[in-house]
């Protein structure tokens, strides 16, 4: 069964990403924190929807794999075009922003991701008012 805490954690991470983007320094390390948080938002939402349809969620951060699993298992989730087109980038944000000291996410890419992931949350009715 879906653990609602996945959604609550995803919303908390989204809020953290927004706050870091708006009030943090515009340096590469801050943008990496924003990107990592956004990847986690998408991952948690996908995993919750998989659990909801009875799929055992694997220990993976691979957004492509999770999207594929949602589609193949009838998860009741809308995968936006931006999410579908950026699965590899989002997956890279999980590992590269944490372990590759030469990897940096540009501010404009973080801004675009903030907007598009908010759209993903909204279209799937994931909001603070609901949870």
Model features per residue range: what roles?
Residues 1-131:
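Terminal alpha-helical segments
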